[in-house]
Structure formats: C-alpha cells, structure tokens
Amino acid sequence: MTRYMIQVRATAMSEAGEFPDDPTLVARMMAFHDEMAKAGVLLDGAGLQPSSQGFRVHYDAGGQARVLDGPFAETKELIAGYTLIDVPSRDDALAWARRFPAPFPGQPCCIEVRPLMGGVDLPPEDAERLIREELAAIKRRG
C-alpha cells in the first residue's frame, strides 16, 4: 500500500476565506470522504485556513531561520485542503482523485496527487525513533 496526498489548490475565493455558494457541496464532500473511509483508504483530510493565517520558515544556506507571515501572493501555489489516502497503486489514487467533487464549482481548480515518501507504515514509536536518528545524523554532518 502507498500513501498519497490529494492536494486541493487554493483559489482567490479560498484565500479570502470564502466558501462556494453551493448548498450541496459540503454534503458531496462529506459523502465522498465517508465513502473513502468505508472503503478503508481514508487516513485524514481537512481544509486549510487562508494563507493570511499562516507563516513560512525560510532557511538560509547557513541554516538560520527567518519567519515570514502570510498572506502569500502566489495563490496558484497554495494549498486549500488535503486528503490523505492509502491505496495499492497509483491507478487507485488516480481513480479516487478523479471522483473528488469539484471543490470550487463554477471556478477552475486544480487537484494535485503525490505519493508520500517511504512506502512502509511504521508504528508511531518507530517513526519517532527514525526521525530522531535522522536529525542526529544531520546535526553530526553539520
């Protein structure tokens, strides 16, 4: 099984914190996510607040962090929401993504689907241990 993230790209509407004026949209989204849950493929999913509520941490070549508060100008590069699924193949991920309800009816929108790195699911304690080991190795390398 491979985990995929279905990313709904932001629009001017989502960045303004507005929702489409479609009374059935929420019901369609909920029904679709419920169907994925019943099929055993849904791991998580949520909409995101506009980028005005977020921040970015930029690192220079020396590893110094600089925080930039939103909003961010390039709406087409932002994510408005995500759904995380666990499916046997790319074709299965594509099949689910194609059935995703149009998140912003009447507006063009893009959904991007990408596999997560690391195809093996680990228990949380093992995942945490591996992350700590990787961070320690990075620190040792400088």
Pin down the residues of each PLM region.
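Conserved, structured core segments of small domains
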Residues: M1-G142
